[in-house]
Amino acid sequence: MDTVVINAVTKKFGQTVALDALSLTIPMGQMTGIVGADAAGKTTLLRIIIGLLAADTGSVATLGLDPATQKKELTARIGYMPQKFGLYEDLTVRENLEFYADLKEVAKDFSKLLDFTGLEPFQDRLAGKLSGGMKQKLGLACALLGDPEFLVLDEPSVGVDPISRRDLMHLVKTTITPKTTVVWSTAYLDEANSFDNTIVMDQGKVIYNGSPSALAATSAAFEREVIRLMGGYEEKPSQIAAHYVYRESNIEYPVEALDLLKMYGSFAAVKNNTFHIKRGEIFGLLGPNGAGKSTSFKMMCGLARPTAGTAKIMGVDIKKNPTLARSYLGYMAQKFSLYGNMSVRENLEFFAGIYGIPFAEIKERVDNIAAHFGLAVYFDQLSEQLPLGIKQRLSLACALIHNPPILFLDEATSGVDVVTRKEFWCHLRALAEKGVTILITTHFMDEAEYCDNISLFYKGETIAIGTPAALKQQAGATTMEEAFIELINRKDAESGLL
């Protein structure tokens, strides 16, 4: 018996076709992963399956019920974890659980879930104050209330570190029964390759539905096959880098952190952090959620004042001359920091003004960078309406509009599909070859392999620094993900936490 049976379902939003005469089945008692390009229709599909959206045409049966007409009966039998975890950040951990228990009309006995997820000591903490990994666990706990027959997880591992991803997978696999069906959409192909079944989507259609092993025998081959199914990827010379004009300088280390310390009361968020980044180097800051990476980023950008130590940008102390130091930076934040109610052109014009480009030059600069980034066709579209990959491209254009010699990228590929990530890194490597110095944080360990050097950050301090090859050798690992987990575990063992 199948948990989900879909026949010829179409869903449109205005003139945009989200699902195009889509048909599929999802087997009962198995874990099924869903992957696909941005705007492939993954989230729309999941919402139709559980009754949050209605199909325009076609039929849907979930657990033998029609989600459109039997939503209440269906809701009692499913657990759903939306993107960004679906939490109320101004409620505590316990209050979130109580709220979802009321919605599901189930008993408010949370002791097992709190113990299982490790959240028991934090039940009175506001959800908004939790780390990414803890939010992830709370979102899962809310979805598991009532022991659902069908668990639907929409990109639950986006924006969290490898240890949190591993913990989430372990929690799910040890919680479900042999009869539980799990559907898990993901941007991580290693996750998709670990499930019983994998669905690959593109442009509102299912282009593969079967076991990962039937698609490819190895993880590397699986990635190649998924990319091929999604239309393939051919690396081309970066037009973005080709039109970038580097500001010449004789500064050996454009970015320097010297004994940076950041205290919040008695808590040390960053402890004596030191690193030097050469011209044209890609330097990665890796670490678990809550390790202090974002705090370090904020200090290097002048958005947070160090308690002690020095941050230098192109030799300029950012505490002494923040305006000059920031003029050398292009900054691309998590979630891209675009203004959703402004058009693509308006966002570019705004950032050009913020970065100090003379008013008389802004139109020409905006027109040129839009042409190089392939954004002109979207000029009049609101940025909130753009596909995720185009938002990413627009955010990078905003960061580069003043030709900065330094780029700071804070999880700039979070939630973006594998092909878009490869294109993005093609541009970054080409920019680095032209002399741009890049500081980047990421939770994708395959991206860490592209960095020239890496600082592994944990509990506010650097626990390892070097090339990817050196860190793997130090950990006795064959992949960066294995090295990441091993070095963190070693640090915990030294501290008596393991």
Can you name each region flagged by the protein language model?
Residues 50, 301:
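Helix-to-loop junction immediately C-terminal to a conserved catalytic motif
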Residues 151-155, 160, 407-410:
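Catalytic Walker B motif of ABC-type/P-loop ATPase nucleotide-binding domains
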Residues 140, 168, 396:
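Hydrophobic anchor residue at the start of the ABC signature
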Residues 98, 102-122, 349, 353, ...:
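Conserved ABC ATPase "signature" region
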Residues 58-66, 73-74, 309-317, 324-325:
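Conserved ABC transporter NBD signature motif
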